[in-house]
Amino acid sequence: EKLDKIIPGTFGKTNDGLVYYKDGVRLNASNLATGSKMFAIIKMLLDTGRIKKQTLLVLDEPESHLHPQWQNVFAEIIVLLVKELGVKILLTTHSPNFMLAIDAFMRKYNINDKSNFYQTKNLGDGFVEYVDVTNNMEKIYQDFLVYLTEVKSIHDSFTDPEDA
């Protein structure tokens, strides 16, 4: 239902490839906006029955081309896939907003026990360690905050107080 509000049309295959139909208009799916494609892919997989219980979806920074508001919607859809269909998700992100949205919707839908969160720790020489932070999400948020604080400080040092 949430996907239908964002991507209200349908998809089909033609000799030209994948097409999107909405209100009698046909559009080559490759011409969809980059952010819309993430929603479209999930919708197509659901519509064709390719996403079902025990499906493993690997999503590498799916929020990277999404407005923060759409990141929140996409996070909720991902959480609902886990809750309603039993889908397994392997997800990476560098977005504090998206991370918080995933965490918030998991709490809202009471599926905290169906997740694990890991954070990379740089060991040097190109090696990293994956640290389980499932029970300490604040560690992730604190690390994100360091970078935001750093750039805010730079911004403030070059901003005239009268312009603020």
PLM regions and their residue ranges:
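Active-site-adjacent bridging/hinge elements
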Residues: K13-D16
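Switch/communication elements of ASCE P-loop NTPase nucleotide-binding domains
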Residues: V19-I154
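Electropositive, glycine-dotted interaction segments
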Residues: E1-F11, K22-D23
